């Protein structure tokens, strides 16, 4: 079974330490987030994860994109849409993905181990933002589709940068406030034309949305099961075998490190429903809020449980 992560990892940016870094800082070229990316890559590699992330160290999942996309801005920590949504001049995440890939290739030449490209989904971007201009805040469909057009370009940038797969994060889809038909059209628009696997991450209770999600044109549905064991019942009831399942099997809301046996038993329950060959083993969600030691230990036990 392939092991992966959902995205964020608890490493911190740091200031310049070496002479070379201080010189870069003097000339305005030092990137304080690169040490955090390198630390995230090394931790995930040491834990044995197959498809890693760059750690998503530059900020929260909405703000990082909103700060770069035309027609959006951040005020007092809130994402605001003030004009028509347009693409940035370049990629938002390709440089970090390439850097993470370079670090990984320095650790191993095993091409089965790669870096996933991650984008925050169009519905989550729009519903997490305050609309102050151009779009109707009571009818967000147009904004969602314009955002999908921007994110389709970003997904292609990430693919061209060497991403092993593309993950679209859509936590808002389980909340009940999103128009699922529009959400599906937006996701399908992003996925169309990509040559690598596309995974859709939706955390939360999937009881009212799984039937819709199964119709989306993605290769993998990434869902949480450790923190929401009731999702297993929903999966068993509604599953049809035309997609992979990203199987969240460690709880990212608690510092408690699950034992290998506990994780293994949960994975077995998932395999009994969808088949071991359809499982991608990962945490429930991002790990940003966990202590680094707990995050690493959870990943290590997860990988060992998946391999035994």
Swiss-Prot record:
Its EC number is 2.1.1.-. Keywords: Amino-acid biosynthesis, Metal-binding, Methionine biosynthesis, Methyltransferase, Transferase, Zinc. The keyword Transferase applies. The keyword Kinase does not apply. Zn(2+) binds at residues 201, 203, 224, 285. Signal peptide: none annotated. Pathway: Amino-acid biosynthesis; L-methionine biosynthesis via de novo pathway. Binds 1 zinc ion per subunit. InterPro entries: Met_Synth_C/arc (IPR002629), MetE_arc (IPR022921), UROD/MetE-like_sf (IPR038071). GO terms for molecular function: 5-methyltetrahydropteroyltriglutamate-homocysteine S-methyltransferase activity; zinc ion binding. One of its GO terms (biological process) is methionine biosynthetic process. Its cofactor is Zn(2+). PANTHER family: 5-METHYLTETRAHYDROPTEROYLTRIGLUTAMATE--HOMOCYSTEINE METHYLTRANSFERASE. Belongs to the archaeal MetE family. Catalyzes the transfer of a methyl group to L-homocysteine resulting in methionine formation. Can use methylcobalamin and methylcobinamide as methyl donors, but methylcobalamin is not considered to be the physiological substrate. This is Methionine synthase.
């Amino acid at each position: 079974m392939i092991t992966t992560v959902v995205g964020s990892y608890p490493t911190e940016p740091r200031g310049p330490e070496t002479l070379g870094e201080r010189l870069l800082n003097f000339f305005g070229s030092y990137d304080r987030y690169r040490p955090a990316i390198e630390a995230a890559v090394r931790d995930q590699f040491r834990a044995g994860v197959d498809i890693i992330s760059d750690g998503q160290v530059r900020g929260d999942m909405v703000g990082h994109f909103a700060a770069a996309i035309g027609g959006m801005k951040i005020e007092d920590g809130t994402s605001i849409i003030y004009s028509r949504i347009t693409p940035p001049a370049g990629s938002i995440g390709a440089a970090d993905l390439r850097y993470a890939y370079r670090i990984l290739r320095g650790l191993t030449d095993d091409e089965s181990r790669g870096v996933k490209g991650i984008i925050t989904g169009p519905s989550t971007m729009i519903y997490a933002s305050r609309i102050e201009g151009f779009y109707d805040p009571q009818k967000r469909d147009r904004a969602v589709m314009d955002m999908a057009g921007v994110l389709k370009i970003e997904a292609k940038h990430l693919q061209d940068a060497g991403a092993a797969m593309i993950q679209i994060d859509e936590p808002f889809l389980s909340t009940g406030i999103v128009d699922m038909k529009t959400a599906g059209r937006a996701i399908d628009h992003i996925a169309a034309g990509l040559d690598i696997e596309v995974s859709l991450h939706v955390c939360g209770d999937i009881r009212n949305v799984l039937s819709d999600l199964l119709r989306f044109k993605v290769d993998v549905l990434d869902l949480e099961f450790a923190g929401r064991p009731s999702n297993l019942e929903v999966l068993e009831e509604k599953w049809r075998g035309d997609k992979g399942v990203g199987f969240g099997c460690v709880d990212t809301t608690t510092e408690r490190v699950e034992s290998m046996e506990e994780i293994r038993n949960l994975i077995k329950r998932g395999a009994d429903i969808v088949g071991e060959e359809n499982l991608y083993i990962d945490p429930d969600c991002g790990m940003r809020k966990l202590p680094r030691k707990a995050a690493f230990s959870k990943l290590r036990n997860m990988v060992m449980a998946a391999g035994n």
